[in-house]
A protein has these predicted regions:
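Long, compositionally biased stretches enriched for glycine and/or charged residues
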Residues: 24, 41-285
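C-terminal motif of bacterial Sec signal peptides marking the signal peptidase cleavage site
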Residues: 15-18
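Short, low-complexity, disordered segments immediately C-terminal to signal peptides
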Residues: 10, 20-45
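Bacterial N-terminal signal peptides that target proteins for export
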Residues: 1-9
């Protein structure tokens, strides 16, 4: 998931069968503050202080990150003991590739950002294990941090991938020990603790996405893939595309009775644009 996708995920508007959502506008950026100037020129320019090159982060370090920190490109938080409460753990530390065709590129260039947005999700998959579907149904996610431009200019070339889990829509869950976290989704019943659940029927009043270890009344039981290219097929098309499969799946989970409930959550246009080609099938429970 790209950092832009993560920002959007923190403000997702659900559009489910029989339900409509209200768009949430993004906050306007704060205006920049102009630097103060002096009418009298300085006789001598003060020597610039070179940026201190920080040591590379340590793999398996733990942090108490907050939600606003997740969308920042850099992070200078002090590690905490992994035996204490923490909301992030570094699962990989790598080296930035800042040379393209013999030319140096900036740490915030598209080339470097592509490296981070492909490397860290693959490292997350390897770390937590499980199938692609299990990971899509889980509340686990990954964020990445790199040096600041000044630190990069001074020689810092590392990046780190941090594993996180969402407890609610915009609240991080405390993470378990490293022993329990590594390979977590490869264990039986993992989604009962780390899966995607809801506090009400999806799209209904009072609905909030929560981690399944919290109180809930609905849960996502599967993802349903959708065919299509780059262009969004349209709401009516994606609504119909997975509804039948979700209905059949929910009925089978209900013992093939004629009376059952389900919710088909199809991807929005924005989610489709970010590469999501599946929706969620929900049932009470």
């Amino acid at each position: 998931m790209t950092r832009l996708a993560l920002v959007a995920a923190l403000a997702t508007v659900l559009l489910l069968a029989g339900c409509t959502g209200t768009p949430v506008s993004s906050p306007e950026p704060s205006p920049s503050v102009p630097a103060s100037s002096s009418s009298s020129p300085s006789p001598e320019a003060a020597p610039s202080t070179p940026a201190v090159v920080p040591a590379a982060p340590k793999r398996a370090a733990c942090y108490r990150l907050s939600t606003p920190q997740l969308t920042k490109p850099t992070n200078a938080s002090t590690p905490v003991s992994c035996g204490s409460r923490h909301t992030a753990q570094t699962i990989y530390v790598g080296t930035l590739d800042t040379v393209v065709d013999g030319h140096a590129v900036a740490v915030d260039s598209a080339t470097v950002q592509r490296q981070l947005s492909t490397t860290c999700p693959s490292r997350l998959a390897a770390y937590v294990g499980g199938s692609t579907t299990a990971r899509d149904l889980s509340r686990f996610n990954v964020v990445w941090y790199s040096p600041s431009l000044a630190q990069s200019d001074a020689g810092a070339d590392w990046f780190r991938c941090d594993l996180i889990a969402f407890a609610g829509e915009d609240q991080l869950a405390p993470l378990p020990s490293t022993r329990k976290l590594r390979g977590a989704l490869g264990r039986s019943g993992a989604l009962a603790d780390y899966g995607l659940c809801g506090t009400a029927a999806p799209g209904a009043q009072g609905f909030e996405r929560v981690i399944c270890s919290r109180g809930h009344s609905w849960r996502a039981i599967d993802t349903i893939g959708l065919a299509g290219g780059k262009r969004y097929p349209g709401t009516s098309q994606v609504r119909k595309a997975g509804d039948g499969d979700c209905r059949d799946l929910a009925q089978s989970r209900a013992g093939n009775t004629l009376k059952f409930r389900y919710g088909w959550e199809w991807p929005t246009r924005a989610q489709w644009g970010r590469g999501q080609r599946f929706g969620y099938c929900w049932i009470p429970g």
